[in-house]
Design a protein with these regions (language model features):
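Active-site substrate-recognition segment that forms the wall
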Residues: 88, 129-137, 225-227, 233, ...
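Rossmann-like flavin
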Residues: 103-211
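Glycine-rich FAD pyrophosphate-binding loop
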Residues: 62-85
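Extreme N-terminal leader/targeting segments of oxidoreductases
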Residues: 1-45, 63-64, 68-69, 95, ...
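Glycine-rich Rossmann-fold phosphate-binding loop(s) that bind the pyrophosphate
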Residues: 49-55, 75
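Helical element adjacent to the flavin cofactor pocket in flavoenzyme catalytic cores
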Residues: 159-160, 185-247, 251
Length: 488
């Protein structure tokens, strides 16, 4: 007899080429067409990439310098990459403040965490100002401990927040407190922060696009970058045109792995999500009445949330590593990492494991989204020695609030502003580098598989044992390379 999780996984449809979020957003409002670039043009700033980082950068530029001439080029349509395919968690980083402090020092780590938390409040004001329909719910997130085997809230992070007057921003909860948000019998505790909003990510992309077009930003979709020629002005070369710009901002996310300069800066992986049919009655039965986001505390965590039409969207639990950053190839590794039925079934099984009450639920869509995975788990913002080429990369699947803050940083760098955003601790080269191929893919794939296997053993009541030690050894090998350059 198949388990409930296996029966649930059997209901998962094939992995789609576009996310359910983007399909729904385009149905609601296809928006004004943005044709490809044809011919030559000039601009004060050219933004390369139409995801959140590029769109927020263009927004900040036009906010601070009305009348500035901004061109944005996007290889597909705005939001076709990770920005339109994620969980829609516009979140702070209080839960990882100890990690931030490890890399940046305590004062700077807390300053960056506070900057991200502020973006959540600012999003509320942005939505009201622009009358943006992005299905935003600023209700917080529960970092659930779904079983005694999962890590409890980090006590070191709690101490750091208390020292800086932010103890109330991440509150430890017991089992009853965790289950108040949603009635999972797995929840034994966790931590809650109010500093998160769930959004429909593709609708946020489309609303940003709408606002920018209204401000006179020239957006060229289906216009991939072929070459970036340094100089003053710099030249962005596309298949049928060129943009000469005083400043260029490079925000192509995971696709930057194809550029020699960033090949060692991060690994590229795809995360999988599924979404259920509308199940309002079943959600009421388990007490899931709010739009609080939820993430558990396994090594390959699940993240999940309600939608406005009473579905559950869940992702995580596994990932598909891309060989040498090959996101668009047709080889077996690229196809598996992009469309694997097995990887799509992992979050589907996870939903029924977390909520056995939802056994038999039908899933309506499955998709995957690319991530530029920095080993430190934090982005970096870099200006080339020429002074007029800037990049924001490495968002590592935590990019919604980080790209809004990052847009401020990249705008400051492009405008030459000497302000707090130009001096965030994430401004500079990547903190860590990843191994070269052909080592990177097998090491990353092995780490992912071992962590997923260990989580599954714990779910079944078996200890990780040798799996934990093997995962640690492979991860240590992955982290061992410490070259002096991101090249090659």
């Amino acid at each position: 007899m198949r388990s409930g999780g296996d029966r649930c996984a059997a209901n998962v449809p094939p992995v789609g080429a576009r996310s359910w979020w983007l399909d729904e957003a385009l149905k609601a409002d296809p928006g004004e067409p943005c044709p490809p670039l044809a011919g030559e043009t000039a601009a004060d700033v050219c933004v390369v990439g139409g995801g959140f980082a590029g769109l927020w950068t263009a927004y900040e530029l036009t906010e601070r310098a009305p009348g500035i001439d901004v061109v944005l080029v996007e290889a597909d349509i705005c939001g076709a990459g990770g920005s339109g395919a994620n969980g829609g968690f516009f979140s702070c980083s209080w839960h990882m403040v100890a990690t931030l402090c490890h890399f940046f020092g305590e004062d700077e780590g807390v300053r960056y965490a506070k900057a991200l938390a502020d973006q959540v409040d600012e999003l509320d004001a942005w939505v009201a100002r622009h009358e943006a329909d992005i299905e935003a719910h600023h209700e917080g997130i529960l970092y659930a401990q779904a079983g005694e085997w999962q890590d409890p809230p980090d006590p070191e992070g709690q101490k750091i927040l208390a020292r800086h007057g932010y103890a109330d921003r991440l509150r430890v909860v017991e089992a009853a407190g965790a289950r108040r948000y949603a009635g999972s019998p797995r929840f034994v505790g966790g931590a809650f922060t109010p500093d998160l909003a769930t959004v429909q990510p593709a609708k946020l992309v489309r609303e940003l696009r709408r606002v920018l077009l209204g401000r006179g930003v020239r957006i060229y979709e289906r216009t991939p970058l072929k070459e970036l020629l340094p100089g003053r002005p710099a030249t962005v070369v596309t298949p049928a045109g060129r943009v000469r710009a005083d400043q260029v901002v490079y925000t192509v996310g995971a696709w930057a792995a194809g550029h020699p300069h960033w090949r060692r800066a991060f690994a590229v992986a795809r995360d999988f999500m599924v979404v259920t049919e509308p199940i309002p009655e079943r959600l009421r039965e388990i007490g899931w009445l709010t739009h609080v986001g939820i993430a558990d505390s396994r090594e390959m965590l699940y993240y999940l949330r309600r939608t406005d039409d009473d579905r559950v969207a869940i992702g995580g639990g596994a990932m598909g590593a891309m060989y040498d950053g090959d996101l668009d190839g047709d080889g077996p590794i690229a196809r598996f990492a992009r469309t694997s039925p097995r990887l799509a079934e992992v979050p589907a099984r996870g939903l029924v494991w977390l909520f056995p009450q939802l056994e038999g639920v039908r899933f309506e869509a499955a998709w995957s989204g690319p991530m530029d995975v920095d080993r430190a788990g934090v982005p970096f913002f870099f200006t080339a020695p020429s002074g007029n080429l800037h990049a924001g990369l490495g968002f590592s699947g935590h990019g919604l609030a980080a790209t809004k803050a990052g847009g401020k940083t990249l705008a400051s760098l492009a405008l030459g502003a000497d302000d707090e955003w130009a001096h965030l601790p994430v401004v500079g080269p990547p903190l860590t580098l990843v191994p070269p191929e052909p080592l990177r893919w097998p090491l990353l794939q092995a780490v992912s598989w071992l962590m997923e296997t260990g989580d599954r053993r714990e779910e079944e009541g078996r200890p990780r044992g040798l799996v934990r030690r093997a995962a640690q050894r492979v991860f240590d090998a992955y982290c061992a390379a410490r070259p002096t350059s991101a090249h090659g």
